[in-house]
Curated annotation (Swiss-Prot):
Gene3D superfamilies noted in UniProt: 1.20.1280.50
Name of this chain's protein: Putative F-box protein At3g25750
Domain F-box: 4-52
Lineage per the UniProt record: Eukaryota, Viridiplantae, Streptophyta, Embryophyta, Tracheophyta
Pfam families linked to this entry: Beta-prop_KIB1-4, F-box
Cited InterPro entries: F-box-like_dom_sf, F-box_dom, KIB1-4_b-propeller, SCF_F-box_domain
Taxonomic source organism: Arabidopsis thaliana (Mouse-ear cress)
Length: 362
């Protein structure tokens, strides 16, 4: 049997391969392989748009809730420390966003220097994970509506044949695409408000505002409590600002973002990470992440290996915040001593190099 050259693959096969990818970046990289692949894989609007129902149910018919996918990537330069990378985030092209957009990795805000571009032929690109956010638009004008408060969304989609779950407005919705329907149905018996959902070991879990984990039954469209609430003591803090779910070393963990309020300004002062001890059947605090780092971004929470990123501190948690001038800043919380360092500190600039993007073209 003769060996077939990559450039001689049938157009039908290349088109089928491109349709299997959910990331616009992957499609662009396929087209950049060679001239024949570029001509075979058309960059149509349908292919660039998100391959799932983009609109979510709303109580106000005058607005549209648009589900927008974003993707985290690790970027490396062959000419400079190929084992070290930078963290970037992109928003896929869709009906609302005509082009792939570069975003700040933690806040998800668009990088304002619109003239900058990323040449995929000059860098190494590896996908880390996808995340999803909700954008609110005027139902008549299809224009984005500015919001006074943040709307958080997390979204799980395995394939076109598996039910998809969306967390929106502290409630959980499901869409069973294999039945040919694209309508959203609210999960039954939701007695609590929820702050995050996650796909773990083939099952979908949610965490409520009290730190208890619930299992979502997609066959029955119901939710069942699996664990008790985490033993969080607030005597040092005013509140738990946010609660997330994350996988760490195969375990399902809960991350609490703790804050205090002074002069009507809320400020993050620390984090607590818990995992369930199956033998003791109770929550235990995770005091060390080893060589890993936790990234707490808008709409997403995940771990990375610190040594694979420029300046990344191991056993730490990176997160973003907005100062009194509404300007975004990045901070890092160190689990070993509980200290917090911010990006504006000149002496600590090196530990934030993973978020700088020296490879962008002007």
């Amino acid at each position: 049997m003769e060996k077939t050259e990559w450039s001689d693959l049938p157009e039908e096969l290349l088109d089928l391969i491109a349709n299997r990818y959910s990331s616009n970046i992957d499609v662009l990289r396929i087209r950049s392989t060679c001239k024949s692949w570029r001509s075979a894989v058309a960059m149509s609007k349908e292919r660039l748009q998100f391959r799932f129902e983009r609109y979510l149910p709303t109580s106000n018919k005058k607005i549209k809730a648009h589900l927008s996918p974003t993707t985290f990537f690790r970027i490396t330069l062959p000419s400079s420390c190929p084992n070290k990378g930078w963290l970037v985030r992109t928003r896929q092209a869709s009906k609302m966003y005509r082009k792939i957009t570069l975003l700040c990795p933690l806040s998800g805000e668009r990088i304002t220097r619109s003239h900058q571009t990323l040449d995929l032929l000059k860098v190494g690109v590896s996908e880390i994970r996808q995340s999803y956010e909700i954008q609110i638009f005027d139902g008549l004008k299809d224009e984005k509506i500015p919001l006074d408060s943040e709307i958080f969304s997390n979204y799980i989609k395995n394939s076109d044949k598996i039910p998809s779950v969306n967390y929106h407005d502290n409630k959980i919705w499901c869409c069973k695409t294999r039945e040919g329907s694209r309508s959203w149905t609210k999960i039954k018996n939701q007695v609590e408000d929820f702050s995050d959902i996650i796909l773990h070991m083939g099952r979908i879990y949610a965490v409520d505002l009290k730190g208890a984990i619930w299992w979502i039954s997609l066959s029955q469209l119901t939710i069942v409590q699996q664990t008790s609430s985490t033993p969080l003591d607030y005597y040092k803090y005013d509140s738990c600002q946010d609660t997330r779910l994350v996988e760490y070393c195969g375990d399902l963990c809960i991350v609490h973002e703790l804050s205090i309020t002074r002069n009507h300004i809320q400020r993050t002062v620390g984090f607590k990470v818990y995992k369930m001890d199956e033998d003791l059947a109770k929550w235990v605090e995770v005091s060390c992440l080893g060589d890993n780092t936790l990234i707490v971004a808008c709409n997403s929470c995940f771990t990375v290996v610190a040594s694979e990123y420029h300046g990344c501190l191991k056993n730490s948690i990176y997160f973003s915040y907005y100062d009194v001038k509404k300007a975004e800043n990045i901070k890092v919380f160190k689990l070993d001593d509980g200290s917090i360092t911010q990006r504006t500190d000149i002496s600590s600039q090196s530990c934030f190099h993973m978020f700088s993007l020296p490879f962008l073209n002007y």
